[in-house]
Regions:
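The feature marks helicase ATPase cores and/or their adjacent C-terminal helical subdomains
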Residues: 1-157
Length: 157
């Protein structure tokens, strides 16, 4: 335990968080995440889509590559760049089962904070976990998925 504390002492960020939303609560939750990051003094924020920019759940609210005042682009376009906070959107069952490398590219762009937004429910979390080698879906699939990703979980329904 002491050794773990020594290793973690130099890390400024928080444990990543996955936000489980419905389509109806998605934008309010996204706005809350952005407000929380700003409240914590983080202004270098980017929203990265695990899909394409045009297929993203937030595409209709994006104008000229910006959501509100926040930069928005695909993970592929942001490869090699960094931001203090990254909000990954369009996290789906496919991300877990087929796009792990793309997820890594997006997640590893965050210097301090990583927030993940998804509309996955218990059933889609269970399906993803069952298709992932070594993963097990218990009675609480959303929590189990968050645990597999080493994230905390927040539900916005």
């Amino acid at each position: 335990e002491c050794r773990r504390a020594e290793v973690l002492r130099g890390i400024a960020g928080k444990i990543p968080c996955i936000h489980f939303c419905s389509k109806e609560t998605y934008f309010n939750a996204l706005d809350d995440v952005i407000s929380g990051l700003r409240r914590d003094g983080i202004d270098d924020i980017v929203i990265l889509s695990l899909s394409t920019e045009t297929d993203s759940i937030v595409s209709g609210a994006v104008k000229n590559g910006v959501y509100g005042e926040i930069r928005f682009m695909s993970c592929r376009k942001f490869k090699g760049l960094e931001a203090d906070a990254v909000i990954l959107v369009d996290f789906t069952e496919r991300t877990v089962t087929d796009d792990a490398m793309l997820f890594y590219v997006g997640a590893s762009r965050a210097r301090i904070r990583l927030e993940i937004m998804t509309v996955m429910d218990n059933e889609s979390c269970r399906n993803a976990l069952e298709r992932t080698e070594g993963a097990c879906a218990g009675r609480r699939p959303m929590r189990d998925l968050a645990s597999m990703l080493k994230c905390t979980a927040l539900v916005h329904y």
